[in-house]
From Swiss-Prot:
Belongs to the UPF0502 family. PANTHER family: UPF0502 PROTEIN YCEH (PTHR38768:SF1). It comes from the Bacteria. InterPro entries: DUF480 (IPR007432), WH-like_DNA-bd_sf (IPR036388), WH_DNA-bd_sf (IPR036390). It comes from Aliivibrio fischeri (strain MJ11) (Vibrio fischeri). This is UPF0502 protein VFMJ11_A0613. Gene3D superfamilies: Winged helix-like DNA-binding domain superfamily/Winged helix DNA-binding domain.
């Protein structure tokens, strides 16, 4: 299994997320992709990537056909889509639920099954936490190439968290430090509203670009 950088996995996670939640805006322009990477909602850690940072990683992923440039016709604006999984010749095949779980792990770091059930609501449906646990167990069951790992339960916590392995092995210390900020999130309704606002901002950016292109002609 290829090991990705943190920036690469953030980009892949954003493309997966936007493909599902805002298909009318997908594939994404570089500007929209950078905005998605740096969202303050549904991201942990929050990043401040530049267009150049994102483009460098996008170009590296294009070289490996994990991302493709889907620029059409006479358009002067490049648009990107992922080929992370479920492609005709690719070996990685994922169900909608598996893809949703990995997407949230890519974007928000280690999560409990309960958190994953709540935070995947805009991506897929889970009837209960047990279904999430079954998906996680399946993703971790591959002896030669496990996709996720169950972390040791933290003191005072009811549930153990799971982390993805696409950026390499996860140390308990690193996972704990990265999770600390998200423990202050008070309720998922506010987070969902923030995500909707972020999606609207993306649409506004795309409309601005379209208007500018029309004015230039």
């Amino acid at each position: 299994m290829r090991i990705f950088s943190e920036t690469e996995i953030r980009i892949i996670g954003c493309l997966i997320e936007k493909e599902i939640t805002t298909p009318e805006q997908y594939p994404l322009t570089l500007n929209a992709l950078t905005t998605a990477c740096n969202q303050k909602s549904n991201r942990d850690p929050v990043t401040s990537l530049t267009d150049s940072d994102v483009l460098d990683s996008v170009n590296a992923l294009i070289q490996e056909r994990i991302i493709t440039d889907e620029t059409r016709g006479n358009s002067r604006v490049a648009k990107y889509q992922h080929r992370f999984c479920n492609t005709e010749f690719g070996s990685l095949k994922l169900s909608k639920q598996e893809l949703a779980v990995l997407c949230v792990l890519f974007l928000r770091g280690p999560q409990t099954p309960g958190e994953l059930r709540t935070r995947t609501q805009r991506l897929c449906e889970f009837d209960n936490v047990a279904q999430v646990e079954n998906v996680l167990n399946g993703l971790s069951a591959d002896e030669h190439s496990p996709k996720v790992i169950k972390l040791a339960k933290e003191p005072g916590k009811r549930e153990a968290r799971f982390a993805h392995l696409f950026c390499g092995e996860v140390s308990q210390a690193t996972a704990t430090v990265q999770q600390a900020p998200s423990e202050s999130h008070d309720n998922e309704r506010i987070v969902a509203l923030e995500s909707d606002v972020a999606d609207l901002k993306l649409e506004v950016e795309e409309l601005k670009k379209l208007i500018n292109n029309l004015l230039d002609k």
